[in-house]
Amino acid sequence: AQEIITNKSPVSILSNILIIAENNSLTIKATDSTVKFTTSLPVDIQEEGSTTIFCDKFMSILSNSPSGDMEFIKDDITVTIKPIAKKVKFQLKSQTSDKFPEISKYDNVPFFEISSKDFKEMIKETIFAVSDDRNRYFMTGVYFIKNGDILTMVATDGRRLSCVNKSAVNIPDFTPAIIPTKILSTVLKHAPEEGNIEIAVI
């Protein structure tokens, strides 16, 4: 989530993460208005609710807290974080969740598997050629398309052009898309070197 948000946004709420506690699950959402991130984990909940807190300070608290369970307590204007194993607590100012941009939930989306190594190689061979000119949006990401049994990634900044192909056997057809570099950089950083990853193009 921290890699998705931006502290340079004129919209302060985009520097926050949205935290939702419901159905014995804690869901965290983040967005920079272009890229969206959602993850969930099982938790014990005494009272359901939601709020937003400043992501960088929250991550600083987590990185400086002992390992183990933590307790989150929310009131109207703050969130209190208490590591169970240590007699200390942290407080963060919060903003109401109704100010946070809507992040759509897509059910029954068809995912397909691809070799993580192959996908990361495709990213490395194209991402360097992406334009950083925000006035030419179609050049600020990598074009991703399936043509027959071939997956193709293409990137250009108007001067350089990079194109890479990989076999797409057993991969279903999908609508071509421009993938933002922030997503691709995150995949490069966190995707495993071996095994497969799942992708859905909506």
What is the meaning of each model-derived region?
Residues A1-I202:
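Structural preference for solvent-exposed beta-strand-turn elements
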